[in-house]
Amino acid sequence: MAAHHRQNTAGRRKVQVSYVIRDEVEKYNRNGVNALQLDPALNRLFTAGRDSIIRIWNVNQHKQDPYIASMEHHTDWVNDIVLCCNGKTLISASSDTTVKVWNAHKGFCMSTLRTHKDYVKALAYAKDKELVASAGLDRQIFLWDVNTLTALTASNNTVTTSSLSGNKDSIYSLAMNQMGTVIVSGSTEKVLRVWDPRTCQKLMKLKGHTDNVKALLLNRDGTQCLSGSSDGTIRLWSLGQQRCIATYRVHDEGVWALQVNEGFTHVYSGGRDRKIYCTDLRNPDIRLLICEEKAPVLKMELDRSADPPLALWVATTKSSVNKWPIKGILNFRSSGDYENDCSTPLSPICSQPDQVIKGGASIIQCNILNDKRHILTKDTNNNVAYWDVLKACKVEDLGKVDFEEEIKKRFKMVYVPNWFSVDLKTGMLTITLDESDCFAAWVSAKDAGFSSPDGSDPKLNLGGLLLQALLEFWPRTHINPMEEEENEVNHVANGEQENRIQKGNGYFQVPPHTPVIFGEAGGRTLFRLLCRDSGGETESMLLNETVPQWVIDITVDKNMPKFNKIPFYLQPHSSSGAKTLKKDRLSASDMLQVRKVMEHVYEKIINVDTESQTTSSSNNEKPGEQEKEEDIAVLAEEKIELLCQDQILDPNMDLRTVKHFIWKSGGDLTLHYRQKST
């Protein structure tokens, strides 16, 4: 079946905006490593991270700092990578539903394939044919000609792909032989499905495993297949006989990763039990425990620069990657240094790795403070940090302190509505803004720590300010479209226009390296760019296609959202002896301070005798009016108490805080007033 791939646009889909708070250069894997590829010719190791980043390392042991570069374009876990074209091209598969094609030598993304509709979990590569297959949770397998992929350009951006149908469940593993004549998939269906990729014909279905098939390998001519499963077994299959010919029960738990030597005689296996074994396929009882990792094994890569291999690179759910020496271990069959009594625990032959690609810490816990601006996090090294969501930066490293105590220490009796969500999936803070609540949080400039040029204390919308900062470099946001023509007429001639352009929000900027992601609510990424790059011609064009209207409204059209209103009732307190008023439902901004309600009570209810003196028109302010207002404010605080649930309210508190922390009930907020006893 032929299918065509083109760049998607936002259309009518619900689009969210996300951004990642991080350093400009993230040198270390910040989470588990899902995949490895080794280029022995250049001494380079590629690691595919759960932090969404592919990194390139120099594995020459004499190098003090092995980091070379990062390949960044994915927005979710990178689940698999394959090196093609003698190491020139890298293909990657991600949970962001895309397959990407990279220049492996220069480290940039050449094209993005959006054919999959769900997480892409596995890739397979036929070296002799330069053919790659991709598969994932959408149950689809697509075949890609690598030479066609590397020839894609901005104008020539359509590629035809073949697909293999028939899978009934999510695919987690894939293998293709070097000659490109056989492809095998493993899935939660617990069976192996086999196709001929040349004709896309299904050849057979192999049953035997009792759980998800997580790892697959084929020999060169495609006659034998090895599978590793969450059921804890490794199976060897004869495709000619269409059956399992051997079962290896080496591990205590699920088998997630396999490697095999060139002769297809010895299998290296790892998984949930953290142990890595080498097993002789010709004699299932002959096995050797190479090492024990500190975390479950996700992927292994043999150093094939020599035969037999000299080393095994191992990636786990931790962020460091280890190189274990295996030189000479294939001779263990004749040396007698192995255990063939499976009931006797084996001792690992390696206690320390030869080389470690050190990883960084991953954020594993977070707490959004009740100012709804700052976040406390705890990482895998038990370090606590303090972050500013609005400015997209880390404020302070607090070290190994008590996380819960820090939360208590920073508690304020203030309520701000939720306006963003946090995701820790990549091990870094990813903040997502959604149209449904992005504009829910208003604060005063003073409370936010911002000063206004005219000395006033305007109300600021946190979500609106942030969107303006994230798109500050996008030219379309610089001039209000209503004023654009007038500005050009008035200022171009004298060169003043550039100076007149207002960028951003006028209060703060976010770090220019901040990644900004536009994606569907379901998780599919539409466009990723760095904040500073939105001024580029290509980026501007893609933003025009992708940015949803709710973001355009605030960043381009400068239409601020409306204030949130809160309904409430105002009644005399039972202790005041005053007659209960007619129950009128009042409404005010949820940021209205209690003192303003006290002033209303003093002016309109208690002090009725002077009412005529305090209702002057706001359009015709008279001398002394400001003083009169200040007098009323002072008198109101001296004479009036406002209560909620019989608790006296702080005049500085706002209505939303009263409702959240004190009212705590369904229905409309009810406030009671009384005169202070003298």
UniProtKB/Swiss-Prot annotation:
MF terms (GO), sorted A to Z: deubiquitinase activator activity; DNA binding; double-stranded DNA binding; single-stranded DNA binding
Origin superkingdom: Eukaryota
GO terms for biological process, alphabetical: DNA damage response; DNA repair; positive regulation of double-strand break repair via homologous recombination
Composition-biased stretches (Low complexity): 610-621
Region (Disordered) residue spans: 608-629
InterPro entries in the cross-refs: G-protein_beta_WD-40_rep, WD40/YVTN_repeat-like_dom_sf, WD40_repeat_CS, WD40_repeat_dom_sf, WD40_rpt, WDR48, WDR48/Bun107
GO cellular component, one term: lysosome
Domain notes for this protein: The WD repeats are required for the interaction with deubiquitinating enzymes USP1, USP12 and USP46.
Role of this protein: Regulator of deubiquitinating complexes, which acts as a strong activator of usp1, usp12 and usp46. Enhances the usp1-mediated deubiquitination of fancd2; usp1 being almost inactive by itself. Activates deubiquitination by increasing the catalytic turnover without increasing the affinity of deubiquitinating enzymes for the substrate. Also activates deubiquitinating activity of complexes containing usp12. Together with rad51ap1, promotes DNA repair by stimulating rad51-mediated homologous recombination. Binds single-stranded DNA (ssDNA) and double-stranded DNA (dsDNA).
Name of this protein: WD repeat-containing protein 48
UniProt source species: Xenopus tropicalis (Western clawed frog)
Lineage of origin: Eukaryota, Metazoa, Chordata, Craniata, Vertebrata
Gene name of the record: wdr48
